Amino acid sequence: MNQLPIMAKQAAEIASNAQELSNKLKDLVIDASWQTNTNTIDPLVFAITIFVLASFVGYYVVWKVTPALHTPLMSITNAISGIIVISSMIAITSSSAFEFSSLLGSFATLLASINIFGGFIVTTRMLEMFKK
């Protein structure tokens, strides 16, 4: 019976130590979550990186293709530009009159349309060369 108060005192110390460790662990988890949130990649840097890599890949694909495959490459480029035109028109209609997305969508529609019409002209000239 004399050991009961000693065991109660030890249990209280263990509970106190467990509570202290729990509080420290909670602080560590909060600090870790703050550190992971501050080390994320900026979306603008990510988008610019993808743009630069896509530019290099596109450059090497276009310049390394054999001349016999230029016409199919032009048709694929026209198809991709058609998808861009549709997407940019959706961007124009999904916002109000003078928001950034509508202006960017209008600019994308203009550039993709120029690309499509230029592609058709170049493809027509290439096909006329094969007729001769």
UniProtKB/Swiss-Prot annotation:
UniProt keyword annotations, A-Z: Cell inner membrane, Cell membrane, Membrane, NAD, NADP, Translocase, Transmembrane, Transmembrane helix
EC number: 7.1.1.1
InterPro entries recorded: NADP_transhyd_a_C
GO function terms (MF aspect): NADP binding; proton-translocating NAD(P)+ transhydrogenase activity
UniProt-annotated location(s): Cell inner membrane
Chemical reaction(s) catalysed: NAD(+) + NADPH + H(+)(in) = NADH + NADP(+) + H(+)(out)
Keyword Kinase: no
Protein name: NAD(P) transhydrogenase subunit alpha part 2
Domain of life: Bacteria
Organism: Rickettsia prowazekii (strain Madrid E)
Subunit description: Complex of an alpha and a beta chain; in Rickettsia, the alpha chain seems to be made of two subunits.
Predominant location: membrane
Membrane-topology descriptor: Multi-pass membrane protein
Primary role: The transhydrogenation between NADH and NADP is coupled to respiration and ATP hydrolysis and functions as a proton pump across the membrane.
Family matches, as Pfam families: PNTB_4TM
Listed transmembrane segments: 43-63, 72-92, 103-123
Swiss-Prot/TrEMBL GO biological process terms: NADPH regeneration
Recorded GO CC terms: plasma membrane
